[in-house]
């Protein structure tokens, strides 16, 4: 077997616009929320910051109590958007394992005065790049007592 490399192939970097992402995600969210308005499982859907902004602003999300965003591409900036969302203020369970969260992002989050997720009972952050000190800082924060 031989492999030939070379050539002048050109590849386009196609990144959909925010509006296109919002439209596509709304088409996914609508039937899921109609089926179960209190629980939403979006694990492994390549959700990153733009998609989190759509989720944060999508009014039907107000009824969701349990949100599974595990195994996605959620970073520290997206984490801020989730926790500062008025629409997601009723969340009781948030699953964020296997994402791109860091200890620094968690430390910045606990310092925020804009946190709206006051009803959280379950927060899963396993398999992220979190430090022991950032977890301790979160546990001692008034936001998470």
Descriptions of predicted regions:
Residues 1-145:
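Leucine-rich tandem repeat or coiled-coil scaffolds
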């Amino acid at each position: 077997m031989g492999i030939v490399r070379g050539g002048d192939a050109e590849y386009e970097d196609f990144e959909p616009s925010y509006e296109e992402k919002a439209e596509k995600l709304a088409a996914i969210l609508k039937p899921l929320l109609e089926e179960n308005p209190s629980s939403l499982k979006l694990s492994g859907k390549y959700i990153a910051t733009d998609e989190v902004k759509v989720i944060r602003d999508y009014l039907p999300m107000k009824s969701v109590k349990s949100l599974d965003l595990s195994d996605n591409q959620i970073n520290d900036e997206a984490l801020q958007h989730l926790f500062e969302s008025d629409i997601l203020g009723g969340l009781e369970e948030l699953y964020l394992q296997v994402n791109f969260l860091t200890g620094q992002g968690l430390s910045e989050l606990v310092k925020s005065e804009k946190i709206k997720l006051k009803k959280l009972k379950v927060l899963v952050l396993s398999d992220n790049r979190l430090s022991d000190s950032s977890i301790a800082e979160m546990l001692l924060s008034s936001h998470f007592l």
